[in-house]
Amino acid sequence: MKTCNLTDRMKVKMIMLLFQILAISTLQSDSAYIPDRYTQENVAVRGKATQSALASGGGAVLSLPGYAIDGNRDSDSSHGSCSHTTNGPNPWWRVDLLQVYTIASVTITNRGDCCGERITGAHILIGNSLENNGINNPQCSTVGIMTAGETRTFHCSRPMIGRYVTVYLPKTEYLQLCEVEVNALLPAN
C-alpha cells in the first residue's frame, strides 16, 4: 500500500477546492443563492483580526480589531463592540481566517453612534497574500454610502478563494467596523 506524501495531499486538496469552485460557479452576485449541498457560514469568528493602527487616547481599549469579529452587531462604539483605527492615510483592517475558504460575500455593520459616512469608498479584498497588508489581493466589492448603524451584505461578483479578508479605505480617515462577517460556502453534512 502506497502512503501519501505531503505533495499528494496538497494535490488532493487542490482538486477538492477546484470541484468546490465548479460546484458553486452558478452563484449570482446579486442574490443570496446557495447551491444545493452547501451551507453559508460566517467563518470570521474563528479568525484573528489586525488593523493598521489603534485609535489613540482613552478610547483605545474600546477599539481593538477583534471586536469586529466577535459575533456582536452592536453598532455603538462606546460599548466596546467596534474596531477603530486612527485618523490616517489609507487605514485597513484584516482578518486571517486561518485557512483558505470559498467566500461568497462579506457583511459589514457600520458604526451607529456617529460618523456613518466614514466607511464610504472602502474596498473589500480577498486573497492569500499578505503583501502590502493584503491590499494587493483581488477586490470583492466596494462599500458605497452606508447609514450609521446599517448592516449590509456585499456579494462578490463570483465566489472568491482566500484566507485573508481586508477592508481598505483609500483616503485619510478613520476606519470603524462594528462587525465583519465573512460568508463562506461550506459543503453541507
Curated annotation (Swiss-Prot):
It comes from the Eukaryota. Ca(2+) binds at D70, N72, S81, C178, E179. InterPro entries: BG_Antigen-Binding_Lectin (IPR051941), FTP1 (IPR006585), Galactose-bd-like_sf (IPR008979). GO terms for cellular component: extracellular space. One of its GO terms (biological process) is regulation of innate immune response. Belongs to the fucolectin family. Homotrimer. Acts as a defensive agent. Recognizes blood group fucosylated oligosaccharides including A, B, H and Lewis B-type antigens. Does not recognize Lewis A antigen and has low affinity for monovalent haptens. This is Fucolectin-5. It comes from Anguilla japonica (Japanese eel).
